[in-house]
Amino acid sequence: MMDKDSFILPKDFPELRNDTFLRAARGEEIEHIPVWCMRQAGRYLPEFRESRAGKDFFETCRSPEACCELTLQPLRRFPFDAAIIFSDILVVPQAMGMEVQMCPGKGPTFPEPLKEPEDLQRLKTQVDVYSELDYVFKAITLTRHKIEGKVPLIGFTGAPWTLMSYMIEGGGSATHSKAKRWLYRYPEASHKLLSQLTDVIVEYLLGQVKAGAQALQVFESHTGCLGPVEFKEFSLPYLRDIARRVKDKIKESGLDNVPMIVFAKDGHYGLEDLSESAYEVVGLDWTIDPRSARVRTGGKVSLQGNMDPCALYGTKESISEIVRRMLEGFGTKGYIANLGHGLYPDMDPENVGAFVEAVHNHSRQLLKR
């Protein structure tokens, strides 16, 4: 029998009590700098490992109750200013008809990756996200109710190039050479696949907003293997298309606009372009200097990031000092503190707490000046 929670409707949500994250995303006044972490619902938490023990990863992703619980776990420990729904970027290729398995110690694996352009015929041409990915929407709606207005809930997706790379490589890759071979050898087929992915992603993000997501993040995790020319041809146009189309559809649906974040990891060369792409927030990794990022984006967007996650292996004192420098570099306006990548499984939860505390404390000092 289905849990009654599965039938909870995306309306009458509890009132939001802490909207600091949403205000910072829009560049509005704040009392403290908001902070959250990519992969804050993750294996570094003993309770997360306990909840996940012995369960198939994607089976967990398909359980709204499990996703809700995992999303809420970090909020019980730390005063984060936002939650991000527990899910995975690879649910999109699954919805398009590809099989993905999570192999312990190896990560996500596609038993039958796309090898040549004719393999595109294996993908569904029409994807009904509301039937294929309804479990994500249900998880978002359930979590919005269970979070009781404590903080906003972020929905997310992988970006087209990042998903294309997984679908061709068959998993993670150091060089992405199989996927990049397509860009150089089969540019037309590459654009066809990227367009197909974009269409599904737009509907998927709209569905997340309808379900209750209060912000959206688009993860372009594999920007670093592209040069500036390839980025401008195979990544940027699709990132822009997603933001514009999602915003148009939100408007058409009579829903309130939600802030959108684009995170193109290692895409320094694209910073100016990304700041003119209809996203309210640009996420940064730790290889960019905060002050130069401010200059290069010219106040057009809010910024999110960008502490090296490995700084969390240091002492609480060093974490506090690194956070102070980071905040002084970014300034307090239009800024969301985060890491420049996700939390790693072997990190000490105590140090994650120290990071959050340092952001809140230092930002209150800065705002008094």
Swiss-Prot record:
It comes from the Eukaryota. SUPFAM superfamilies: UROD/MetE-like (SSF51726). The keyword Nucleotide-binding does not apply. Coproporphyrinogen I binds at residues 39, 41, 43, 52, 88, 166, 221, 341. GO terms for biological process: heme biosynthetic process; porphyrin-containing compound catabolic process; porphyrin-containing compound metabolic process; protoporphyrinogen IX biosynthetic process. Changing residue 38 to R: Reduces uroporphyrinogen decarboxylase activity. Pathway: Porphyrin-containing compound metabolism; protoporphyrin-IX biosynthesis; coproporphyrinogen-III from 5-aminolevulinate: step 4/4. It is found in: Cytoplasm, Cytosol. Catalyzes the sequential decarboxylation of the four acetate side chains of uroporphyrinogen to form coproporphyrinogen and participates in the fifth step in the heme biosynthetic pathway. Isomer I or isomer III of uroporphyrinogen may serve as substrate, but only coproporphyrinogen III can ultimately be converted to heme. In vitro also decarboxylates pentacarboxylate porphyrinogen I. It comes from Danio rerio. Its main location: cytoplasm. Coproporphyrinogen III binds at residues 39, 41, 43, 88, 166, 221, 341. PANTHER family: METHYLTETRAHYDROFOLATE:HOMOCYSTEINE METHYLTRANSFERASE RELATED, UROPORPHYRINOGEN DECARBOXYLASE. This is Uroporphyrinogen decarboxylase. HAMAP family: URO_D.
